[in-house]
């Protein structure tokens, strides 16, 4: 039950944060030139994607015989190279497309964030009817695009005018409609609205707590500083541990996997920095 609740909003929340970071960067003078944005996101997102995919994910998947293709070459080229089944790394390609789409739309056609948010919601709902292969995670980019614009909107929105009861009502209303309807497009629309409400509630809650106090703890500083490295490396470590320790009781396996995957990811991050290869992680 707890896992279901977390999975309901954790990716929308991450995308919203990415949109907020983009908005803050743009306010400080970044991303004014499309070419510089493109080069920056290739270096920050696609270089880590192919580095981690080929040196960590592919060997792990093939070594543990987890690939669904009969040929290892098919997995190596079709699924990883073209981003069709890239495990947790799909987020890098999706985020790359979101940066490009947002910069293109806001730079040339649509300056109003609300208009962009509405159009993104229409595209997101339309993605529920997407059939076929999701090349380079483009469908996932469209699916989560509203949350990127939401993050941008939350940055420019006057925080004093945002009341907690509004997103709470949105979540409750959306949940009720989801229970009462059996329409695919309505389910997609109100699932999206419910996620939007949950993300806004989380963001408003974070604003009310002492963020500075949270950031002052040394462990939190370490995790935040190396969070991208943890994201890149933790899944292959989890695959290996679960494969060899699957007979352990679940109450032992889960915390053990969680702790060791974080420590292992921090270790790989530190090694790459020591070797001056942090560029392979997008730094």
What are these regions (language model features)?
Residues 4, 8, 36, 44-45, ...:
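Residue-level signature of transmembrane alpha-helical entry/exit and packing/kink sites
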Residues 20-24, 98, 102-106, 144-160, ...:
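Hydrophobic transmembrane alpha-helices
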Residues 210-224, 237-283:
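C-terminal "closing" transmembrane helix and its immediate cytosolic amphipathic cap
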Residues 57, 117-128, 166-181, 199-205, ...:
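Hydrophobic core of alpha-helical transmembrane segments in multi-pass integral membrane proteins
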Residues 4, 8-13, 26-60, 69-87, ...:
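Transmembrane alpha-helical segments and their boundary/interface "anchor" motifs
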Residues 2-11, 79-93, 128-149, 177-201:
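Interfacial loop-to-helix transition and helix-capping segments at the boundaries
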Residues 130, 159-221, 236, 251-252:
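Alpha-helical transmembrane segments and terminal signal-anchor/GPI-anchor hydrophobic tails
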Residues 99-121, 153-170:
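Solvent-exposed interhelical
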């Amino acid at each position: 039950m707890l896992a279901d609740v977390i999975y309901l909003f954790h990716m929308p929340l991450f995308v919203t944060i990415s949109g907020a970071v983009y908005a803050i960067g743009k306010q400080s003078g970044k991303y004014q030139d499309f070419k510089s944005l493109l080069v920056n996101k290739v270096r920050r997102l696609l270089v880590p994607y192919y580095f981690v995919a080929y040196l960590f994910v592919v060997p792990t998947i093939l070594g543990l015989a987890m690939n669904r293709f009969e040929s290892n070459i098919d997995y190596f080229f079709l699924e990883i190279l073209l981003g069709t089944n890239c495990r947790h790394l799909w987020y890098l390609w999706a985020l790359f497309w979101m940066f490009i789409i947002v910069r293109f739309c806001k730079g040339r056609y649509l300056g109003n964030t609300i208009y962009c948010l509405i159009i993104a919601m229409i595209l997101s709902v339309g993605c529920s009817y997407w059939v076929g292969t999701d090349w380079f995670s483009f469908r996932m980019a469209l699916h989560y695009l509203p949350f990127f614009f939401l993050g941008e909107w939350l940055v420019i929105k006057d925080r004093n005018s945002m009341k907690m009861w509004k997103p709470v009502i949105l979540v409750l209303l959306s949940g009720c409609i989801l229970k009462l309807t059996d329409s695919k497009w309505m389910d997609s629309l109100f699932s999206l609205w419910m996620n939007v409400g949950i993300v806004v509630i989380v963001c408003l809650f974070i604003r009310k707590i002492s963020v500075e106090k949270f950031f002052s703890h040394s462990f939190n500083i370490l995790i935040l500083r190396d969070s991208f490295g943890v994201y890149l490396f933790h899944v292959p470590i989890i695959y290996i541990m679960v494969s060899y320790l699957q007979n352990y009781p679940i109450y032992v396996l889960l915390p053990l996997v969680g702790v060791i995957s974080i420590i292992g990811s921090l270790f790989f991050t530190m090694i790459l920095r020591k070797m001056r290869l942090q560029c392979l992680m997008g730094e």
